[in-house]
Amino acid sequence: MGGGYPNATSTVRFIEVEKPGNDQSFGDLTDGLGKMSNAGFGSRTRGFTAGGRKYQSGNTDFNVIQEHEFASTGNFNDFGDLSTTRNEVMSMSNATRGVIAGGNNPSPFNIMEYITMSSSGNAVDFGDQFTTISTAGGNIASPVRGLMCGGANPNDGKVNTIQYITISTLGNSSDFGDMTINRRFPSAGGNAVRGINAQGNNPSVTNIIDFVTIASLGDAQDFGDVSADAGSSGGAASSPTRFVMFEGDGTTAQYVQIMTKGNTIDFGDIQDRQGGGAGGCSNGHGGLG
């Protein structure tokens, strides 16, 4: 969804996660969101995107939340607004609630907000991140927990901290553990048991994939490597069995079987290259069980 630097696109593309192949046209966002529009999340019926930046309009940041039904292709619709305009936003969801965290404009935020995905409206305060890590991290969810992985800290640069929340309970995030490396803009996802972070940069692009067991606090472990061209700020999508990642500034899509450690396998091609910062969501991710 969206993406692209310096020329933002409003294009939305889709895949069927269990069927390797090239992406297809879905529709358009209401605005062409730029490179930092990587807040994507979903329920079983709707996909969402929130915030972002449109570089063609003098680095304009947005607070808009948009949605569309997964069952039919078409353009996204207005859902509501975040409390502030910002980009580099993180997000996670279970079947009922979507949480949007962090971002910057131009200074970083540590705020977290939420929406009830079945009811249009503006985001409401959820709590604060326990650390100043607040931008461009990876997003993972189970039906119970949401994880924010790595990202950027204004004092320390790229970081490896993983923090978590209980999605159904308002409050501040807590420390979960650490990723195997410091990185920003990873592609992230998983199922209800295991969360995966792949790619990203620090400062050059990395091909490392690591994973956590979402129910157990602790550090990430090695999963494998990105076999083809690794990218940064690429979108991702998950089913209960498969995690698909997109290159970011390239045209490749690769996947892994979530419960089987190993290197990525070719999935298909991105027909309409969207560039870095494209958001991703699915109706089969870990937050849905």
Task: Describe the function of each predicted region.
Residues 1-289:
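Polar, enzyme-active/binding microenvironments
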